[in-house]
């Protein structure tokens, strides 16, 4: 009986830790993450203070923080080829990173680090030099900056069969030297690295290439991490938020279900399907059942996004900033519909898959610059600064914890729905106007459309909608309007 009780206690403790790792540790009613891809730490700190916090963002996913290989031309993907766990990259050094984390936490913005636990750098001709000046010989699996030697890696082999579990989890992903996470020594170095970031005040981690590591090894690593640092405003015994990159199209041996109990999982099917819908390849009327009915993970297990730094560069259904009208409609739907843990993308312009972030002649990443409307210039796209997107972050905050209700569609590509009695969204993806009296579910009054403008000094700078005592209002979205979406919420009532 004593043995049974002990086993039950350990089982419950493990379940409790796993559930805790699904909690993003947001501040207040905020509930949207932004990925500031390849931004410098000093610029993120300022963005937290001057833009993200005032507009209600919840957190920032940052690019990998550890030393990486220096590749010719400085492609973005060099950040995903570790040389050591020293916190020096083109985004800044450890002191600058720590300052950024502190300043963002001070204004209620949580930091989530993209971490590389699966591998080190791939082959390099001769001695490679990292962004902190550390030398390594990847072809010999020699990384003195950690240190790792060949015995800390799986034997070299290629992934040729994605239905072969051994190949997927023990061979080299695109030639990257594959760490043996079952080794006590490797585990200790990874835990030490993550714990140092926790000590500096981060709230959690995006785990790159999680499907290429055995779930049992990740479970051990996650379970061995320290609690979040209470000096940065986290409650006692709070666990780091974990969200794992698991690309699962539903037909491979390694599945997302192996990982979703350990933490959230990146729901790539969400990205693909929302792209198909707003590109016109699937009628919007079908989105009424959006979520688990589409084969997605449970809402609290799914990290959701329209695009990410990888798939925005691929050909296919995924939307990106280059289709701005459809992208803004898809993002509005994403942030208005009650499903998933939402993340929005903040990109830099690219012409090909390898385009580096904006940089000067000395290959230093340059800071974003802004025009008079606050939009980014000089090579940065900054979708999070588009009014139509940051306004929907405010919408999502305003309607938090409300249910979907009042669904309407025209049988095709015009839809609307309510979020309780706090918010209303309408979308027109048809080639003709939407002009209709619709139930907004809102209290009577005049509301500003936060897509076309905002509430300033008691007046709307864009469209407005008058809602009658029955909750109905006249909604017009022209087929040639600049934006194909309209959004109202109680915090934008005149």
Swiss-Prot record:
Its main location: secreted. Its cofactor is Ca(2+); chloride. SUPFAM superfamilies: (Trans)glycosidases, Glycosyl hydrolase domain. Chloride binds at residues 206, 308, 343. This is Alpha-amylase-related protein. Belongs to the glycosyl hydrolase 13 family. It comes from Drosophila bakoue. Monomer. It is found in: Secreted. The lineage of its organism: Eukaryota, Metazoa, Ecdysozoa, Arthropoda, Hexapoda. Ca(2+) binds at residues 118, 169, 178, 212.
